[in-house]
């Protein structure tokens, strides 16, 4: 097994989570290559010590021992890997591909089968923890795949993860766990927004309400993280409203296939969809609070 700078890892998708993962690779001493359509993100990673960056991972694919794909959805994963300029055809046989996007179980299985056709190993490995944990190499990874995939991706997992859960050998299991996790995440944000909106309507200063909740039993990680954005009036997207429209849509699809009712998740999906329809889709997911009328929210601090 190669280690340190002998191990070449590529990452496609340099958003807040992907950039954090890439910087963790650099910090771990791995030879790091990055790809993103955003030239500024590529420049940031190059300045941090990456071996190379590009708008297309195919340009450096033959150098890689492992590839992490962390883009928005399954369609983007398939385009990155199997599109006209897809990277899969350029990877060395035996290269391990870690797919960390939040996607449906069926898509994970389909992608794994297609990668196997190129003699490539896939780890179905969605991640969580937010941008800060990603930057610190402390993400939670929910992974399923073969022992070989886990072994070949060991340097990658060690660099980015605070905790790795091995869900099983079948691709799709990791994605299912992540989807169920996103049910909770979305409901927590929606419930937090509803509570803060009620506080605003009742005339309670939102900084006071936030302080009370974060020091009491009603707190959650999502409330503490996301409602801080509301208090600060800062909706710069760390994870956008439209991400939860997608993720809670995956939750709904999963439940529908199992004929299983999800009343809270369904309501949360409707709230995020309403926020997106109102024009807030690209704002931080905490902007779901803006669907409530008759309240005044804090403005951005200068």
Curated annotation (Swiss-Prot):
Organism: Escherichia coli (strain K12)
GO MF annotation: an example: oxidoreductase activity, acting on the CH-OH group of donors, NAD or NADP as acceptor
Top-level EC class as recorded in UniProt: oxidoreductase
Full protein name: L-threonate dehydrogenase
Binding site for NAD(+): 7-35, 102, 246
UniProt GO BP: organic acid catabolic process
Keywords: Carbohydrate metabolism, NAD, NADP, Oxidoreductase
SUPFAM superfamilies in UniProt: 6-phosphogluconate dehydrogenase C-terminal domain-like, NAD(P)-binding Rossmann-fold domains
Lineage: Bacteria, Pseudomonadati, Pseudomonadota, Gammaproteobacteria, Enterobacterales
Disulfide-bonded cysteines: none
InterPro entries: 3-OH-isobutyrate_DH-rel_CS, 6-PGluconate_DH-like_C_sf, 6PGD_dom2, 6PGDH_NADP-bd, HIBADH-like_NADP-bd, HIBADH-related, LtnD, NAD(P)-bd_dom_sf
Keyword Oxidoreductase: yes
Keyword Oxidoreductase tagged: yes
Catalytic activity: L-threonate + NAD(+) = 2-dehydro-L-erythronate + NADH + H(+)
Family: Belongs to the HIBADH-related family. L-threonate dehydrogenase subfamily.
Annotated EC: 1.1.1.411
Active site: 178
Role of this protein: Catalyzes oxidation of L-threonate to 2-oxo-tetronate. Can use either NAD(+) or NADP(+) as cosubstrate, with a preference for NAD(+).
